[in-house]
Design a protein with these regions (language model features):
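Substrate-gating cap/lid alpha-helix
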Residues: 13, 182-221
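Surface-exposed cleft-lining segments at the edges of enzyme active sites
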Residues: 95-99, 131, 138-153, 185-193
Length: 278
């Protein structure tokens, strides 16, 4: 009987000891400084390399600062984003070039290939000189039919441009500006030109819809839509008292290329598209 009591007493003492040890350990653990939960990782800022290829709109003809038109302006806009570390740009704009000439440079210019390969995004302007040179060639005999061949050639050239850029860099997003009618404010009765521009822009947009990582940038709505109507001014010719409407987004020297305000609008359209896609 004494042995049983001794065994029970020893077991009870052991259990009490275990409880005390567990209590002390638990108290010690609670007193230790708990690691603070990790705060959300700050998103790493991105360095952006933008390559612009095209005609006089890419070169920036009409920009009073002679600083690359929409290219310098989109660089400034992108650097305001919290997620962007820095922005570098390359401008391969050549005034007067048709779409076939731009395509040839994309395919053969080693500098363009190098920059496109390293680009995060590529911006294109093309097609305007295809129309202008067709008008110059046909002169007084020009008609809607005159542009059929030029439009078909433009379509094929644009497809090849997109394909070649994608070969150089399949991850780069391509943005393609549409065309605008510079004559709408000054020759509102010239409906054929607006019809022609709509057809070309529709063709461009259709091609881009079938191209991965490509976005169409419509700008005719800026140069000739309600935005222009709300900001345009008028002047009166002293000789014949004729009222002339002035487009606030066109360069006064030629009334064809964008001015500073026009390039700012082009950059804004591109900026909004980039924010949506990137």
């Amino acid at each position: 009987m004494k042995k049983v009591r001794s065994f029970v007493s020893g077991l009870l003492f052991l259990l009490i000891g275990v409880v005390i040890v567990v209590f002390v350990l638990n108290l010690f653990v609670k007193q230790q400084p708990q690691p603070k939960p990790q705060s959300e990782k700050v998103e790493e800022k991105q360095a952006i390399h933008l390559v612009a290829i095209g005609d006089s709109l890419t070169k920036g003809v009409g920009d009073s600062q002679r600083n690359g038109g929409y290219v310098s302006r989109i660089r400034s806009k992108l650097t305001t984003l919290d997620t962007v570390k820095n922005v570098t740009t390359e401008n391969f704009g050549v005034p007067g070039e048709r779409s076939d000439e731009i395509l040839d440079r994309i395919k053969t210019d080693s500098e363009i290939k190098k920059e496109v390969t390293a680009a995060d995004m590529v911006i294109l302007t093309a097609g305007g000189n295809d129309i202008v040179q067709t008008i110059k060639k046909e002169k007084l005999s020009v008609s809607e039919k005159s542009f059929d061949h030029a439009l078909e050639a433009y379509r094929e050239n644009l497809k090849e441009m997109l394909q070649q850029i994608s070969v150089y860099n399949p991850k780069a997003h391509i943005y393609v500006y549409g065309l605008y009618n510079p004559y709408a404010a000054y020759f509102p009765d010239l409906k054929e030109m607006q019809t022609l521009l709509i057809e070309w822009n529709t063709s461009t947009e259709t091609i881009i819809k079938h191209q991965p990582l490509a976005t169409f940038l419509p700008i005719d709505i800026i140069f000739n839509g309600t935005d222009r109507l709300n900001n345009q001014s008028t002047t009166t010719d002293a000789d014949d008292a004729e009222t002339v409407v002035e487009n606030p987004y066109l360069y006064e020297e030629d009334l064809f290329h964008p001015n500073d305000a026009g390039y700012e609008k082009m950059a804004e359209v591109l900026f909004q598209a980039i924010q949506k896609n990137e």
